[in-house]
Regions:
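Low-complexity, intrinsically disordered or signal/transmembrane-proximal segments
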Residues: 144-145, 157
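Ligand-binding beta-strand-loop-alpha-helix segment within the catalytic cores
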Residues: 125
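Selected transmembrane alpha-helices and immediately adjacent juxtamembrane segments
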Residues: 166-167, 175-178
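Ser/Thr/Pro/Gly-rich low-complexity, intrinsically disordered segments
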Residues: 132-140, 154-156
Length: 292
């Protein structure tokens, strides 16, 4: 038995277990298995993902992210705020900002108040139309195939006939298939999320974000995250929704995104940089004593 000190944090209800590899020797262990065990809500600590503090040659620190199923993630907008909250709390209380290395590149985080942080999320990429090729029968009334690149395309593969759903494929540090619907509450995300996540057209899997526009600067959303399932919030998903909405004329470039766990603020600035603002709360810390 090797006791591991951990920290439990959450941002807009998206929760994480954090381990500091600089403060304690982490066992030479299968990190995928460790993430699955720590994130288990009945037999572990319980979380959507695992964050690991590691040294970096490119930034102040490196953030390693593993999903609840043990898969590695490149970037997490809520996770990086929680990661930064821990660093300000326990390592660099006087820093004006922090540069954090992620799988998607170095991201800078600014502390606005004790529990509120702003992340420079980088430049989004609006990908070619989702590589989903529904049959003519599947298309139904949703539209016609052959939409040009970088525009929303009819999507009914795994969605069903008659929904009229259109999707935009956006990369904001993580790949998101963004769908706009009349009602996020009525949208069958728990059914369609895993089907789209594992669709053969996405060999690396994909996150699924569904949004309901309430106003040009306000949207309600839910996200199915690859490797974690339905979560209370998703930072890269909020960014992807704003990019897709602005790109298709539904939204302005500064938007409040209401997710089940709270509100995230996204700005897509004129220089093409995405900014994500939201809370990050250190909930508790403890020692995990389970046998590895």
């Amino acid at each position: 038995m090797i006791p591991l000190r951990f920290y439990k944090l959450q941002g807009a209800g998206n929760d994480f277990v954090l381990l500091d590899a600089l403060a304690q020797p982490l066992p030479e262990h299968d990190f995928a298995s460790l993430a699955r065990r720590l994130c288990d809500r009945r037999f572990g600590v319980g979380a959507d993902g695992l964050l690991v503090v590691e040294p970096s040659h490119e930034a102040d620190y490196r953030m390693r992210i593993l999903n609840a199923d043990g898969s590695e993630a490149t970037m997490c907008g809520n996770g990086i705020r929680c990661f930064a909250r821990y660093l300000w709390e326990c390592r660099c209380p006087d820093a004006a900002s922090l540069a954090i290395e992620t799988g998607a590149g170095v991201r800078r985080v600014h502390r606005l108040s004790a529990e509120r942080f702003q992340v420079e999320m980088g430049t989004p990429k609006i990908m070619p139309s989702p590589p989903i090729s529904p049959s003519p029968n599947e298309l139904g009334e949703a539209g016609q195939q052959g939409a040009p690149p970088c525009t929303p395309t009819p999507l009914s593969h795994a969605v069903g006939e008659g929904l009229g759903v259109r999707a935009t494929f956006v990369h904001t540090g993580a790949p998101h298939l963004v769908l706009f619907a009349d009602s996020v509450d009525a949208f069958p995300l728990e059914t369609l999320g895993p089907l789209l996540e594992h669709a053969p057209e996405f060999p690396d899997r994909v996150n699924v974000s569904v949004a309901q526009v309430d106003a040009p600067n306000r949207v309600r959303a839910r996200v199915w995250e690859r490797g974690a399932g339905a979560t209370l919030a998703c930072g890269t998903g909020a960014c992807a929704i704003v990019v897709a909405g602005a790109h298709t004329g539904r939204l302005e470039r500064t938007v409040q995104v209401q997710m089940p766990g709270g509100v995230l603020e996204v700005e897509w600035s004129a220089d093409d940089t995405l900014w994500l603002t939201g809370d990050a709360v250190l909930v508790f810390e403890g020692v995990w004593r389970a046998t590895l």
